[in-house]
Amino acid sequence: MASSIWKGLVGIGLFALAHAAFSAAQHRSYMRLTEKEDETLPIDIVLQTLLAFIVACYGIVHIAGEFKDMDATSELRNKTFDTLRNHPSFYVFNHRGRVMFQPPESEDCHRNQAPFSSNSSLKLSKLEAMHR
């Protein structure tokens, strides 16, 4: 868990950045009123912006924790070859392969039974609807 000191440092940095943005907007509106639009920002606003950005970034780096290596070898060192590309969450057992690759004799039985059962149930439902 990140220390509250670093979180406070990030808060101070973000507050200082917001203050610098407000100061820059206020300075710009003042320059418009005095019709001196070609002047740059004062050095104190520029320095406050840079310092606040550095403080906020420094605090964020400490809150983030340990960085990982850019090399993938450190991650792959702990995995075996079997588990390297093994994603069990992508396994699908309920697919059309069971029906497509059945032996021919079992396909005929299912084909012959399916129309009769659906037709008979359809006829029965029509008859029941007519009697009501």
Curated annotation (Swiss-Prot):
Name of the gene encoding the protein in the UniProt record: mmgt1-b
Q: Which organism is it from?
A: Xenopus laevis
What UniProt keywords apply to this chain's record, in alphabetical order?
Endoplasmic reticulum, Endosome, Golgi apparatus, Magnesium, Membrane, Transmembrane, Transmembrane helix, Transport
Q: Which residues form a coiled coil?
A: none
- GO annotation, cellular component aspect: early endosome; early endosome membrane; EMC complex; endoplasmic reticulum membrane; Golgi apparatus; Golgi membrane; membrane; plasma membrane
Top-down, what is the taxonomic lineage of the species of origin? Eukaryota, Metazoa, Chordata, Craniata, Vertebrata
Localization recorded for this chain is: Endoplasmic reticulum membrane; Golgi apparatus membrane; Early endosome membrane
Q: Which residues lie on this side of the membrane: Lumenal?
A: 23-43
The family note in this entry says: Belongs to the membrane magnesium transporter (TC 1.A.67) family.
Superkingdom of origin organism: Eukaryota
What is the membrane topology noted in the UniProt record heading this document? Answer: Multi-pass membrane protein
InterPro entries per record: MMgT
Q: What is this protein called?
A: ER membrane protein complex subunit 5-B
Function noted in UniProt = Part of the endoplasmic reticulum membrane protein complex (EMC) that enables the energy-independent insertion into endoplasmic reticulum membranes of newly synthesized membrane proteins. Preferentially accommodates proteins with transmembrane domains that are weakly hydrophobic or contain destabilizing features such as charged and aromatic residues. Involved in the cotranslational insertion of multi-pass membrane proteins in which stop-transfer membrane-anchor sequences become ER membrane spanning helices.
Has the keyword Phosphoprotein been applied to this entry? no
